[in-house]
Amino acid sequence: MREKRSGTAFLFLVAGIELAAAAPASAQAWLPPKGEASFSLGGQNLNARYHLLWDGRRDDRGKMEWYHAISDLTYGVTDRFAVRVGIPYVFSRYAGNFPHRPVGRPVHDDGQWHSTFQDFRIEARYMAATGSLVATPFLSIVLPSSGYEFLSHVAAGRHLREYAGGVSLGRRLDPVLPDTYAQAQLSFTMAQRVLGIWHNKNNADVEVGHFLSPSVAVRMLGAWQWTHGGFRIPLDAPAGSANFQVHDQLAKDSHFILGGGVSYAVNGSLDLSATVFKVMTARNSNEVRGISVGTTWGFSPAQMIRRRKGAAPTASPDAP
């Protein structure tokens, strides 16, 4: 089914914005069949000029820029159960006159390019309903991969453990809207406490796509986040205070992101995609905009192993 790989553009959209604006995980209701895998690789550029304060005011603190190399692997353990792992590699640079200065650590906001792996994301999904409305609950964990700097205008991430649960929903909109589908995801994330402070979040993601042809699809994307607890910037963490040293980790980041994209199926196993997006409104965040391009390759590991050993593929049970 074409929708099974329709979430590729959204995967790159949210994986990247999560680094700069703490956006949610991608909405992927459809899973690969048993024994099949999909590998996604994307490149992304994000930039921002303004911080958005607790009351929505814009604060110009210099130019922030990120480049991401995003990799993601999903494997269908059964027709209804899949696992996913991914990690981004981040290049970033801050150009401005207001660098963050960590206590006892080198300054990251020095006008130079810095790079690091960000966080591992490990996820398990189970397709509980497979009728006209697909429902896929999931559990995920985020683990920092290294000791990267988190106090920076262009930090790679928040360097926190996170545990999330939720459900993805998907439905074809035929016959009302032929060749059109919709996906949505609702999730709740528990983040590692800092200074004993809770700062959990709810996310809602929506994707609506339409196939112009069997190979070409266009889509609109939306992502909302509401953080419960945390710091109002700069009220609760003024410059020079102890709280300022962890204000990026504890920011009460709430935002709405809007995007649009197009994808092209080169063949039955290879997709290309491109997406543009922008933070439309936010509190305690950055006014990020960006563009991403990516490719997804679907394959069967078992068949690849058999080919390497010179064995013929096993016939399908449905084969004549």
What are these regions, as identified by a protein language model?
Residues 21-63, 300-320:
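Outer-membrane beta-barrel biogenesis signature
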Residues 36, 66-72, 117-121, 160-164, ...:
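Transmembrane beta-barrel architecture of outer-membrane proteins
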Residues 38-42, 82-84, 134-138, 179-185, ...:
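Residue-level detector of the transmembrane beta-barrel scaffold of outer-membrane proteins
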Residues 41-43, 71-75, 85, 122-126, ...:
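Residues on the lipid-exposed face of transmembrane beta-strands in outer-membrane beta-barrel proteins
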Residues 43-49, 58, 87-93, 128, ...:
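Transmembrane beta-strands of outer-membrane beta-barrel pores
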Residues 50-52, 98, 105-109, 198, ...:
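Outer membrane beta-barrel transmembrane domains
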Residues 78-80, 90, 129-133, 173-178, ...:
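Outer-membrane beta-barrel channels and translocator barrels
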Residues 92-200, 242-253, 320:
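Outer-membrane pore/translocation modules
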